[in-house]
A protein has these predicted regions:
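Acidic (Asp/Glu)-rich catalytic clusters
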Residues: 75-82, 110-117, 227-228, 258-263, ...
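Aromatic-lined carbohydrate-binding surfaces of glycoside hydrolases
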Residues: 55-218, 224-228, 232-252, 268-270, ...
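Mature N-terminal, pre-catalytic/accessory segment of carbohydrate-active enzymes
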Residues: 31-59
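Short, electropositive alpha-helical surface patch
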Residues: 249-261
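Alpha-helix boundary/N-cap detector
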Residues: 35, 215-218, 331
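Substrate-binding cleft of secreted/luminal carbohydrate-active enzymes
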Residues: 126, 268-369
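N-terminal secretory signal peptides that target proteins for export/translocation
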Residues: 1-10
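Bacterial N-terminal signal peptides
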Residues: 14-24
């Protein structure tokens, strides 16, 4: 009897142990499965085996030039069939050196040069910088009439990271809209497109009392509408990646979603500045919204500084001159292309002209046929 009772107790212990393990495993799996931040964490793996050359497609491929517009001269893109042209960044103060006096001479020069080779130009209009020593807006805006015009933005370590135009200031937006109208009057229908810079900024109300999340969101939408009114024919786009006060999936206030909805509503294309296929912030915000939406407006994605090695120019550990990283890298261009084409279904890709990656990784992957 004692032996039978002992066996029974042992069997019950074994049963409860197994039952507990099953519950724990099920709970762990359930937690992992239901974690919304993990939803797309493995999406990139589908494209790990992609190889060069990338297949021909309907994507409009452009080469991106930031502060190096002179590099378009004799650039390989001019003789390459798969590249439609150049995306070039121009600052607001490049185009408006003095109040109400517009100078588009450098844009005209670049437009005419590319046109000679049958290539198009896509304008990126800069009002934000990532250099504390440089402001992108005209000096006349840096006055009390426009709330100071610009404010320092800060990185995650609290260090100055560049200057952001006060997009939430009504008077400043009025000046921006006038610039867009002047640009559109001369270039709408001629240039391939024009995009506004990213929506992500490092500004909070504690750093500027005139700032509020809602005022900033409203300002973004007003700029989008002004852009569309100025350029009814050329492609218009905004790099909508993040909005202050929100980080999906945990704090979803509907800010970024509303930008995507509004862009679709008024005909402004949507995109992002960094194709980061393994990072949760990007995967859960701009990339998720591009993937999940059903859009009639064009979508675009940029491969910018650092992206060729899985980083961004804002990463604290990013070193553009890291020779070891350059030599040990894997060419992820086929992966990036596959992800953008299939997962995001983009219309435009903007490949930054960064050495040595563009020459050594991008060019060999695109057949010149």
């Amino acid at each position: 009897m004692k032996s039978a009772l002992r066996k029974f107790k042992l069997s019950m212990k074994a049963f409860f142990l197994c039952f507990t393990l099953i519950i724990l495993c099920t709970s762990a799996n359930s937690q992992e499965w239901n974690n919304p931040a993990e939803k797309y964490k493995d999406a990139y793996k589908k494209y790990l085996n992609a190889t060069c050359p990338v297949p021909k497609d309907n994507i409009q491929h452009f080469v991106y030039f930031a502060r190096d517009r002179e590099s378009i001269i004799n650039h390989p893109l001019l003789q390459h069939a798969m590249f439609k042209g150049a995306q070039i960044m121009y600052s607001w103060k490049d185009f408006e050196p003095e109040k109400g006096i517009y100078d588009f001479s450098i844009l005209k020069e670049d437009y005419e040069y590319l046109k000679k080779y049958g290539k198009k130009i896509f304008v990126q209009l800069q009002d934000v910088t990532f250099n504390p020593k440089y402001k992108a807006i005209p000096d006349y805006l840096l006055t009390g009439e426009y709330g100071g015009g610009a404010i320092l933005q800060y990185n995650d370590e609290g260090k100055p990271d560049g200057w952001i135009a006060k997009r939430w200031n009504k008077k400043l937006r009025e000046r921006f809209a006038l610039l867009l109208l002047a640009l559109g009057k001369e270039f709408d229908g001629k240039i391939e497109g024009i995009n506004l810079q990213e929506t992500a900024i490092g500004v909070r109300q504690k750093t500027d009392s005139s700032f509020s999340e809602q005022a900033y969101l409203n300002g973004l939408k007003e700029n989008m509408l002004a852009l569309k009114k100025a350029f009814p024919s050329s492609t218009t786009m905004i790099y909508a990646n993040f909005v202050p006060g929100e980080m999906m999936p945990w704090t979803d206030k509907g800010y970024l979603r509303s930008i995507y909805q509004y862009g679709e509503q008024i005909g402004v294309g949507l995109g992002g500045p960094d194709l980061m296929v393994t990072r949760k912030p990007q995967l859960n915000n701009p990339l998720a919204l591009m993937h999940e939406g059903n859009y009639t407006v064009p979508l675009g994605i940029a491969i910018q500084d650092g992206n060729y090695t899985g980083k961004t120019g804002a990463d604290l550990d990013y070193n553009e001159d890291d020779e070891k990283e350059k030599k040990s890298r894997k060419n992820i261009v086929p992966l990036l292309h596959g992800f953008a084409k299939d997962f995001l279904k983009v219309t435009y890709m903007f490949w930054v002209n960064q050495d040595p990656y563009f020459k050594e990784d991008v060019m060999p992957c695109f057949l010149n046929e």
